[in-house]
Amino acid sequence: MPLRELITYVPCRECSFFHIFQNVKQRFKHYDLTQSLMSPTYFNITDAKGFLESFSCIYRDRPMIVWIDTPFLVDNGCDMKKAKVYTTSEYVKEMIKNITHVDGVLRPPYNLVAEQERTAGVEKEYLFAVVGAEPKGGKIVRKRIEYTLNLLREMGLRNRTKVVSNVGDYNVSVFTLHVKDYYRLLHRAYFYLSLSKSEGFGMPLMEAMSVGVPAVYVNAYSYKEFAVGIPIDPYDIIVEEAGSWRMENYLIKDNDVREAIKEARECAIRKSCYEDLSAKALEKSKMFGQYDIEERVISELKGIMRNYKP
C-alpha cells in the first residue's frame, strides 16, 4: 500500500532543520514526508526569526503546524491564530511569546542510528568532540569555535579534540559526514564541548548524549533544560547585534572554561566518574525518542483542519 504524502516546509538542506526533518521522517510509517524548500505548507520545521518575520502575518489565519527553533531574537510578526505553534525549547518559547501564541514545547528527536551506535563497543579516541558551523561571511560569531580551539591549544589539548566545523583548523567539514560516521565520531569522544553564546536548541549536544557522551557546556539558554555533564555558569548576558541579526550572548570567563575542561579531563580517567555521567546523559536523552511523533502531528493536523472555516 503506497504511503500518503505530507509536504513539509524546511527552508534549507545543509542545516539543523533538515537534520530534524530527516529524524522525524524516520518515525513516520504511514506518511511519506517530502521536503518543500519554497513556501510554507501544512507542516513546517523552520527558523522562528525567518518564519515569523516573513510569513506569520501572511498566514495568520491558515491552519498549519509550525515547529520552530532559533538562537536569534525575533523583532516582529503576527499571532498565528489558526496554527499549532511549537518550539524546540522553553528558551525559544520565552523569546517569541510576545509575537505569537505557543501551544507547547516539542523536542527534536535524535536519528535512530543512535540506538544502534550506543550499543557498539567503541574505544574512546579523543577527549572532546566539537561541532558547529558559523554563518558564511564571518559577520556573526555564535558558536565560539575559534575561541574554543585557541583555549584548547593553549592547554595542550587540541590534538585530543575532533572538530567538525567550517571555521578554524577543523578536522572535518560540516555536513560532509554520513549519519553513521557522524554518530560514531561523537561516540568516540569522552565529552562533547560547546561554548556557544546562545542556542535555540543545540542538536549536536543532544545527539552526543544519545550515544552516552556527556557535555562540557554553558549553563544557560536551552542547554539548561536538558544538558548533562560539566556546566559553566555565565557571569552576564548582553544583546549582540550583527546587521539585522540580534542575539543574546551569555558571557563566560576564560578561567571558568579552563577549570571545566580540567574537570572533564580528570573525570575521563576516573572510571566511576565518567561512567556515572555517561549513564545519566544516555538516560536523559531518552526524552528525545519521540516515537509517537507521527500520531501527534497527524492528529493535530486533522484537528485544526476539522475546525477550519475559511
PLM regions with names:
Residues M1-F55, Q290-Y291:
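N-terminal pre-catalytic "stem/leader" segment of glycosyltransferase-like enzymes
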Residues D75-G77, K81-V102:
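A short, active-site helix/loop in glycosyltransferases that binds the activated sugar's phosphate group
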Residues Y91-V92, I99, V105-Q116, V167-D169, ...:
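Short beta-strand->alpha-helix junction loop in the catalytic core
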Residues L112-Y170:
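Conserved catalytic-core segment of nucleotide-activated headgroup transferases in glycan assembly
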Residues R184-G200, V213:
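Acidic donor-binding loop of glycosyltransferase active sites
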Residues P214-Y217, K224:
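Short hydrophobic beta-strand element within catalytic cores of glycosyltransferases
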Residues L251-E259, A268-K302:
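A charged, aromatic-enriched C-terminal amphipathic alpha-helix characteristic of glycosyltransferases
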